[in-house]
Regions:
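A general lysine-centric signal
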Residues: 2-3, 93, 329, 571
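Residue-level detector of alpha-helix boundary/anchor positions
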Residues: 6-9, 84, 131, 247
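Catalytic loop of the DD-peptidase/beta-lactamase superfamily, centered on the K-T-G motif
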Residues: 20-67, 201-205, 209, 241-502, ...
């Protein structure tokens, strides 16, 4: 295990060693040394357990710094590089918005003309939109509404707060902002109808091939197989890779840090659409006043973002910065988190792409350090990572066991980390992160655990705080069922056992008046209580478990003792 950890750490820092020393300009106009930036990046990644991250910085409207860090697949110890294909998630939407503006420039689409007028039949007559048949507001929807996320739809019908999986209006189109992939998908139908071409064909013709984005597509391509990343969850476990075979303007794009930075650069240089079209696309169409972007239909308001005039343009979020107006876009799903922001007046942009659920937790601090830029991180949901304490396995081991109450939980020690699972709430094994020597938290949900000890110093229960809901779970003391070892088998256990990590430490198994005992020291001898031929415990010691290991011939060769950690004792 130690060898693997060293290899992993070395791989992460290998990216820094190979980087060429140079500087790049931050949003505030100041320059930062590349080595300093990379040190800050790798430190944040390690602290927050960000498995993989790629970064591109655009200066003078051109990609200047493009770098990959960490793993594309940690399970295989395979590293990211700048040609590694990442799932682009909602970065798909902003690229699609540019294609829409190209149709507007060509006079084929009017942003304010109801989109149903471009279709051969009423929208509710399409199978995907039959849910809208009872509400005539579908006739009001325009391309502007779709790109500005003001259609009135939920993000996706499966997220309908009524839990009916239906597509329906929650407000009249144009009334307010509510992020919606459904609106983008509907506009895709219109674009494909107007152009007479599938989305992928249109994207290849208008953007991918002209910009030499050879590793970008709305569909999974065979050439991606040789170098692609998988997502990683909060515990840095790999997630299954979805290889999409249906083009979706709202989120099926596969791309690389190198390719997408070409797109951002071309947009700044006026290569894809005119400056006039870009300004319209990135001008505020609707103000945003909600506390959080998601859930998309939430109505909790805040004045926190009044100062930056947070709003939405056409396919892009918009805000004011001290360095000029900016437009931005995110991409997010389990195991993936991306963010890009451009400031045209500075000819500057930055792109962050992470194949880790922990990635977004460093974006606030990362952008402040290497870009000199503050973003509406709370609205984005980019909650900064929490610092964790460093605890030994001896300390962690005392919390291992079964816990019972309104919920049932099992806590184990694995690879130097505490992990909890609960069949009661269908929670698979997940890491516990220490705040101090008795308090822990989960990353997958807002839950804290506080372990309580009795007067004897042993853990008796754990208190759970699950987003304000309190639970008390008592630690289960296992009942020990005795098993009688035949005296004829005693010689197999007798002898001296030395600690594998410290041969000077010794336990002697002896036959004392017909009872097998463990002589732990010159003054302490404890009887063994057997559950079977290989498992036993020390009498009177509730938190110690012993397992005798046999060779192929059934002879005892060592014993393992679990007590505040796992220790191996070799039979001499």
């Amino acid at each position: 295990m130690k060898k693997i950890v060293l290899l992993v750490t070395g791989c992460l820092f290998l990216q820094v060693i190979q980087a060429q020393p140079k500087q790049f300009q931050k949003a505030d106009g100041k320059k930062i040394d590349t080595k300093l930036a990379e040190t800050q990046i790798t430190e944040l990644m390690q602290q927050a357990e960000v498995t993989g991250l790629s970064i591109a910085v655009i200066n003078d409207n051109k990609p200047l710094y493009v770098k990959a860090f960490g793993f594309k697949n940690k399970g295989q110890i395979a590293m990211n590089d700048t040609s590694t294909c990442f799932y682009g998630a909602s970065l798909s939407k902003s690229l699609f918005a540019v294609m829409v503006m190209q149709l507007v420039e060509a006079g084929k689409l009017n942003l304010d003309k109801p989109i149903y007028t471009y279709l051969p039949k009423p929208i509710p007559e399409y199978d995907d939109y039959k849910d809208l048949s009872g509400d005539s507001r579908w006739k009001l929807i325009t391309a502007r509404h779709c790109l500005a996320h003001t259609t009135g739809f939920p993000n996706w019908r499966q997220f309908n707060p009524k839990e009916n999986n239906k597509l329906e209006f929650f407000f009249t189109p144009g009334e307010r902002y509510a992020y919606s992939g459904e609106g983008i998908a509907l506009l895709q139908l219109v674009v494909e109808t107007i152009s007479g071409k599938p989305l992928e064909t249109l994207a290849q013709e208008k953007i991918f091939r002209p910009l030499d984005m050879v590793r970008t597509s709305y569909l999974w391509q065979p050439q991606f197989e040789n170098n692609f990343a998988v997502g990683h969850d909060f515990n840095e476990e790999t997630l299954d890779k979805s290889k999409r075979t249906k083009a979706n303007a709202a989120g099926s794009m596969e791309t690389t840090i190198a390719d997408y930075s070409k797109f951002l650069s071309a947009l700044l240089r006026g290569k894809l659409i005119s400056d006039k079209s870009r300004k319209e696309m990135t001008s505020k169409q609707i103000g945003i006043y909600t506390k959080h972007q998601f859930p998309s239909l939430n109505t909790d308001t805040t004045s926190a973002n009044f100062g930056i005039e947070l709003g939405y343009g056409l396919g892009w979020g918009v805000m004011k910065t001290p360095y000029g107006p900016a437009y931005f876009k995110e991409g997010h799903t389990d195991g993936w988190g991306h963010y890009c922001v451009s400031i045209p007046e500075k000819k500057w942009a930055i792109l962050l792409m992470s194949n880790s659920s922990n990635g977004e937790s460093i974006y606030k601090e990362l952008l402040e350090k290497i870009a000199g830029l503050s973003i509406p991180w709370e609205w984005e949901g980019y909650i900064p990572f929490r610092q964790t304490a460093k605890l030994s396995e001896d300390v962690l081991g005392q919390y291992v066991g079964e816990y019972d109450g309104k919920l049932k939980a099992t806590i184990i020690l694995e690879d130097g980390k505490l992990k909890v699972s609960s069949k009661t709430v269908n929670m698979p094994k997940t890491n516990l992160y220490p705040i101090n020597d008795h308090r822990f938290f989960l990353k997958i949900m807002e839950t804290e655990l506080d372990f309580i000890k009795g007067v004897d110093g042993k853990v008796t229960k754990v208190l759970l705080d699950d987003e304000g809901e309190k639970y008390e779970l008592k630690k289960v003391v296992p009942k020990v069922e005795t098993f009688v070892i035949p005296k004829s088998a005693y010689p197999n256990y007798l002898g001296n056992y030395v600690l594998s990590t410290d041969p000077k430490r010794k336990i002697s198994i002896q036959n004392f008046k017909g009872v097998l005992v463990a002589k732990l020291s010159a003054t302490e001898t404890v009887p063994l209580i057997f559950m079977n031929f290989t498992q036993c415990s020390f009498k009177g010691v509730k938190d110690a478990q012993i397992e005798f290991i046999l060779d192929g011939k059934g002879k005892v060769i060592k014993m393992k003792v679990q007590q505040n950690g796992l220790f191996e004792w070799i039979k001499q």
